């Protein structure tokens, strides 16, 4: 039987700004099983990142707030947990990889210490134990000369190498859920492919469930088991990756797929555009998106 790791029910997230209340996420439902990859796709501003940040309340201290809904992680509702309990989860049971590896790493801290940090904090490793484990995982993610470069700083690495370090840090404690927020966007195509292959390989080894946020449908086809399509703060369609690609039901999903160029596209071929504009989430339309 498939083990349910995460279940989100009727999630509503809002941001209070001078102009009013931005209803960034409006009634989102989804689930995540052990060892699977769920891709969340949609255009910028559709609510992808806010949805996943809400899981561990990473927008707390900002103007964001969960208005309504359940976030069940192994049966416990994270939406009701206080900050001091969520801190124990972040980096241990639920980890996150962000889009830009340069801003994800502390530029004044040696990369080895950054990978060691969650092990010391969450696993109570000694420094010697943490260093041994950090070297193991840096070698696992394919960082060249990991032992020699353990005391190097982030600026001394390429973009792809920095992202490998970020992945190593996120996976150090073998989390049950890994949230990857457009982790390949800042990389070239060759490096994107390497990072995606690496994530799939590591997922098999530690059986982590992945939520992969992207607007790149090619990446989705490569990595996802299931897909959730977001538009206007709502998940308008979810399904198996083949169902979404070959039998989309929602007009927005169809438009998103149809706007993607293929190998037969030439410079003279007009690309399909979705008419209109995304809904104003200060004044969202009534009903479904």
Could you describe each region identified by the protein language model?
Residues 3-4, 144-147, 240-289:
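Short catalytic/signature loops enriched in Gly
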Residues 65-77:
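Conserved ABC transporter NBD signature motif
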Residues 74-77, 129-148:
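Conserved ABC ATPase "signature" region
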Residues 172-176:
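A short, proline-enriched helix->beta-strand linker immediately N-terminal to the Walker B motif
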Residues 220-222:
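A short, surface-exposed alpha-helical micro-motif characterized by mixed small hydrophobic
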């Amino acid at each position: 039987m498939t083990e349910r790791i995460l279940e989100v029910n009727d999630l509503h997230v809002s941001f209070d700004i001078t102009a009013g209340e931005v209803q960034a996420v409006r009634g989102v439902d989804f689930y995540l099983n052990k060892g699977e990859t769920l891709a969340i796709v949609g255009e910028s501003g559709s609510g992808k990142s806010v949805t996943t940040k809400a899981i561990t309340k990473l927008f707390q201290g900002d103007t964001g707030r969960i208005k309504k809904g359940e976030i069940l992680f192994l049966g416990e509702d994270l939406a009701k947990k206080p900050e001091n309990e969520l801190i124990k989860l972040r980096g241990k049971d639920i980890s996150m990889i962000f889009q830009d590896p340069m801003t994800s790493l502390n530029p004044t801290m040696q990369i080895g210490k950054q990978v060691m940090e969650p092990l010391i904090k969450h696993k109570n490793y000694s420094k010697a134990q943490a260093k041994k484990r950090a070297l193991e995982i840096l070698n696992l993610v394919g960082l060249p000369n990991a032992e020699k470069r353990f005391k190097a700083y982030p600026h001394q690495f390429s973009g792809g190498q920095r992202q490998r370090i970020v992945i190593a840090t996120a996976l150090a404690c073998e989390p049950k859920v890994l949230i990857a927020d457009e982790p390949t966007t800042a990389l070239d195509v060759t490096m994107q492919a390497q990072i995606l292959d690496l994530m799939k390989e590591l997922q098999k080894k530690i059986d982590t469930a992945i939520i992969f946020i992207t607007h790149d449908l090619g990446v989705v086809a490569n990595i996802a088991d299931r897909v959730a399509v977001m538009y206007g703060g709502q998940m308008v369609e979810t399904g198996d990756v083949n169902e979404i690609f070959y039998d989309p039901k929602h007009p927005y999903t169809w438009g998103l797929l149809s706007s993607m160029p293929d190998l037969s596209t030439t410079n003279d071929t007009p690309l399909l555009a979705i008419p209109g504009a995304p809904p104003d989430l200060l004044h969202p339309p009534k009903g479904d998106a």
